[in-house]
């Protein structure tokens, strides 16, 4: 996701402008002018920092917008650095990547990007957050598979997107099952315990897969296309919002891609669960509108081998002229037309996947 700024309502009815930085491996919140803050259980934001071990350290000073600051705040901020150090950002992202990707720092690649391909999609609900949209299985199956999908202003399905971008080389079929009811509340899976990542997010995938198997909704062997004993990929749409959306609950899960390598319970039906990706049911941070194809096409891009092209440490807010912005789905393009119309893959992205052979200029 791109860094985003929004107004957060506080318990006393006042509002604070906050800015969200980072990605699934490392994210943090600042004031509008760049000082790191974090919300305590009382609902208010306090100035904070990360210790060398990545744990969050709060001050006792509540944060306000620059024009409303107290003398105590102003004096403290005069000797306080903005944001986080580049070393902390780099180290924390590496730790987060190591945990989410099971120690593999390389870009994930779980699916061979050619031919017809069945991909498993599981819809999952939390104990305290259920699906809001009606007929979720049918709704998601249509959004992912129906040629020319046009609900809610959409301009095509996810399958359309990949067929078009690959020039017909890759034709995915998304097999949707569920919803299944997870054993824990949303906050268990989405809790941010350190600067690095949500430690229980991968367990959400394991739980969803185990329940789907127990209920007879899926035979995981059917999703091992090359018979190597490893499921090609699992995609989970979880109920509610994405933490990456400006203003969404901080205990929500951040949409991401990773691996279940080495996790307990990752062998089902005699095959191993490995690469996965996940994102939310709803778009934005309020309302009950179903997401568009932008986020799944972004996260599935990781499954095909693509890296993020947006600013991930948040130091400069992602406003570098070197980045693709809305012209790349691996940058800010997944949000084009409210997530309904992601841009075509760039030449660089198609070359990375293998759908295009770049011509070397002499």
What label would you give each PLM region?
Residues 1-271, 275:
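Zymogen propeptides/activation segments of proteases
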Residues 233-235, 239-362:
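Extracellular hydrolytic enzyme modules, especially secreted metalloproteases
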